[in-house]
Amino acid sequence: MALMILPFIGALSVSESLVALVTVCLVYLIIKSFQANIPEGLSRLPGPKPLPIIGNVLEVGSRPYLSLTEMSKRYGNVFQIQIGMRPVVVLSGNETVRQALIKQGDEFAGRPDLYSFRFISEGKSLAFSTDQAGVWRARRKLAYSALRSFSTLEGTTPEYSCVLEEHISKEAEYLIKQLDTVMKADGSFDPFRYIVVSVANVICGMCFGRRYDHHDRELLSLVNLSDEFGQVVGSGNPADFIPILQYLPNKTMKKFVNINDRFISFVQKIVSEHYATFNKDNIRDITDSLIDHCEDRKLDENANVQMSDEKVVGIVNDLFGAGLDTISTALSWSVMYLVAYPEIQERLYQELKENVGLDRTPVLSDRNNLPLLEAFILEIFRHSSFLPFTIPHCTTKDTSLNGYYIPKDTCVFINQWQINHDPELWKEPSSFNPDRFLSADGTEVNKVDGEKVMVFGLGKRRCIGEVIARNEVYMFLAILIQKLHFYNLPGEPLDMTPEYGLTMKHKRCHLRATVRVRSDH
């Protein structure tokens, strides 16, 4: 979101631009005159010289994950750029990022007060909130406990170990039938179109306890809202980095607020229904689990503060929005990689055939017996790096990193793409090779190497839905690979070039799939 300013620069009228220009120049001169003094023993942050008003926007360009990676080669793992009027510290390198987010976690646990963040979940988002004090931490802990409790809820029938497994398994089987139907009718399918609806249905089941028909208007409306959110964020909001623009007409920002209002209205309605029908002895979904953990509980021993209905709405909204975009993007990329590397697809199928068989559906407990599949997922996360940056961080106090002084309230970008493609960490990082995560005999995943892959952030702001997301990607993939063979249209090149956005997606395309019969191979 923070690196989307460039496409929007030309969208202002002449009068708006003149007002902004004069005001920003004055503010720029004032800020420059009050630059912080560097404490003795520390160095000033290196980085490219910014232009007035726009800063380093032109150098960052439309593919910031690449341009900032190149800058890190020149300036090191800690350097500063300027986006509009706001100084931004960019962190690269595995050790540097771990030092900041884990060892100095409290100092880098903030969120910058970006204008657009105030409108996500009406400012009550757990993920985007600038708050990181005791109450926020207690709420995060409570939300994490609720998710953990939900993930262990028993399924409705003995064949499923938990309700999470049941939701994913049933939806994956439905997706397979649908793709088979589409193939017979049209001869090809758009992978993202069908995957995103299936993932949305799983998340609706987990969050709201309800499953929709794939043509249901409410479900498709939610999917479209998520898509609109990504598009609007992708167009950028300069008001995040040039504050005076907050007071000027902004069609993109107006649309952004409208999308968030529509999302929150839907979730509020569902949460209200859950409160009205809540039964402590019958926890139906994540919303019930959150309500259960909030009922008559204090957030911590010293604060008589309970999580309000609005906070529950904010958490559910975060989980739905982030989960839908992240998981659907991961699975869509996975199918693309299966098509791009048919020999790996065949190895994955043989692994499933040998360790699970073809007479039953893969389950969560099979995961440890499928090391190649686990390595494949890790390599997709690493190679695609579809989440090139975390949500921006912010320093909570004056601090230092690698000998450089970083003032309080400095916006911080974490370049996950750089870490996932760092030649110091990975041999031939541009090559797609799941075997890099496997032991010599191919029977175990190297957990140390696996933990180096950056996808869900680190430290105190790490994604609380990570475990559920990883399980969902694993189960969907295991079932799809067991039942379907994916391949490309004859003569059609497969374009794996990512399109930069909130999450990086591949270009929309059409693929083919055939249902495997049990006698295959």
UniProtKB/Swiss-Prot annotation:
Primary localization class, coarse: endoplasmic reticulum
Keyword Mitochondrion found: no
A GO cellular-component term linked to this record: endoplasmic reticulum membrane
Pfam families to which the protein is assigned, alphabetical: p450
Membrane topology of this protein: Peripheral membrane protein
Gene Ontology molecular-function annotations: heme binding; iron ion binding; steroid 17-alpha-monooxygenase activity
Enzyme class: oxidoreductase
Gene3D superfamilies hit by this protein: Cytochrome P450
Binding positions (heme): 463
Keyword list, A-Z: Endoplasmic reticulum, Heme, Iron, Membrane, Metal-binding, Microsome, Monooxygenase, Oxidoreductase
GO biological process per UniProt: hormone biosynthetic process; progesterone metabolic process
EC number(s) stated in the UniProt entry for this protein: 1.14.14.1
Catalytic activity: an organic molecule + reduced [NADPH--hemoprotein reductase] + O2 = an alcohol + oxidized [NADPH--hemoprotein reductase] + H2O + H(+)
Residues engaged in binding substrate: 229
Requisite cofactors: heme
InterPro entries the record matches: Cyt_P450, Cyt_P450_CS, Cyt_P450_E_grp-I, Cyt_P450_E_grp-I_CYP1, Cyt_P450_sf
Record's subcellular location: Endoplasmic reticulum membrane; Microsome membrane
Family stated for the protein in its record: Belongs to the cytochrome P450 family.
Function summary: Cytochromes P450 are a group of heme-thiolate monooxygenases. They oxidize a variety of structurally unrelated compounds, including steroids, fatty acids, and xenobiotics.
Protein name: Cytochrome P450 1A1
Taxonomic source organism: Chelon auratus
